[in-house]
Amino acid sequence: MVRSFHVIARKICTVAVLFIIAIPVFTQEIGVQLYSFRKQLPGNVPVMLEKISKMGIKELEGGGSYGLPPGEFKSLLKKNNLKVVSVGADFQQLAKDPQASVDLAKTYGAKYVVVFWIPHTDVFTIDDAKNAVNVFNSAGKLLKENGIALCYHAHGYEFGAYGKGTLFDYLAENLNPAYANFEMDVFWVKHPGQDPVALLQKYPSRFPLMHLKDRKTGTEGNQKGEADVETNVVLGSGDVGIAAIMKAAKKAGVKHYFIEDESSRSVEQVPRSLAYLASLKQE
C-alpha cells in the first residue's frame, strides 16, 4: 500500500514537472496592429477581419474603420470575436484636444491611447522631449480620469545622447507613470542600437504594451526613425532576439502584445510569427 502510494506520488510529480515545462513563456493573448494589413483592409474589411480571427487573434490595435461607419466596423469586430485594446492618437491633436482621443477610445471600448510620433526637425532635441513631457502628462491626466491609459511608442530618434543617458531616459524619468507610459516596439529599440531586454529591465512596469517585430539579420540601423519595411521578417528569424525579449517582457509586466508586420508579406508572415511564439517554452 505504502509502495503504491509512493509510485503514484512519483507519477504525479513527473506529470507536474512536464506540465510546468510545457507552460508557454507568456500567457497573454497575442494581438495584431491593424497597420500590418493597411493594404488589404480598405474595401475588404469583412473578409480581412474574418481572416485575422481565423489566425487565432482576438486583440487589435487600431482606431480607424477603413471606410466603414464606426458602428458597422464594430459589428464586424463583434462578429469575429475581436476587440480593440488600443487606438492611435496624433501628437498635435492630443495637445490641442485630448478629449477627442478619449472619445475615440470609448467608441471602440479601448483601454489605451498610443502616440506613435513626436513632431521634430531633423534631430530630436531636449526641447522636443520637454514639450512632449508637458503634453503627455497633461493629456494623460484627462485620459486617466476617463479610465484610459496613455502610452508613447518610440521610433529610435529618442535614443540620442543626453546627459549621462539618452533622451528616452529623460522621457521615462519625467513622464508621470500615473499618466503616461510606453509601448515598446522591439524593432525600433534594436534599430537605433539599443537592447530591448536591458530597457525592459531598466524600466519595469513602464511598458504595458509591446509591438513584436523582427528585423532581417544584417540590417543597418539608425536613430532617425527610418527603416525599409521589407526588413520586417517572421518573428524568430531575425536579429532582434524575440525569445529573450518575451521572457523579459513577462517579468517586466507587459500586458498586451501586438505583432506588427509592415512588410508586403504580412498576410503570409503573421501566421508564421504566431506559430513561432506558440513554440516558445520556458527553460
Predicted regions and their residues:
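Acidic/histidine-rich catalytic cores of soluble enzymes
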Residues: 145-239
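N-terminal pre-domain/capping segments
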Residues: 26-112, 280-283
